[in-house]
Amino acid sequence: MNKKYSVLIVDDETEILTMLSRFLNRSGSYDVTTYSNPISALDAFSRQEFDLVLLDIMMPQMNGLEVLEKVMEKNSEQKVVMMTAYSTLDKVLKSHKEGATNYVMKPFDSLQAFERKILEVLKS
C-alpha cells in the first residue's frame, strides 16, 4: 500500500480550496485538510503534522508570509509551497528566505503540472 501524504491547503478563495482538494483526493495519494482562514489553519497545524503545506500569499487577517513564519517556528523542516497570483520577485525571495520550499503561480497552468511540482517537493 502506498503512503498517503497529508496536505494542508490554506487559501481564502474557496474555489481554489475545492478544486485542489477534489483533484488531490481523486488520486487517492493524499489526505487533504483545507482552511480558508489562516488563523484556524495555524491552530490545526499546531495539533497535527502535515507532510506538505500549500499556502496562499495574499489573504485577509494574516498574509501567507506571516503564516509561513509561524509554521517555520513550529517546524523548521516543514515543506511549504507558496501559491501566488503575484510573481513579484520580492515576495518570492522573502518566502524562500522565510523557509518556503517552492512556489507556484495561480492560475495553475495545469493541475497535473501542479501535482508534479508538489510530488517533487514531497520526495525531496
Model-derived features with residue positions:
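Two-component/phosphorelay signaling modules centered on CheY-like receiver
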Residues: 14-33
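Acidic, metal-coordinating helix/loop segments flanking the phosphotransfer/catalytic sites
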Residues: 34-52
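Acidic catalytic/metal-coordinating carboxylates
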Residues: 36-37, 63-66
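Receiver (REC) domain active-site loop signature in two-component systems and cognate sites
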Residues: 59
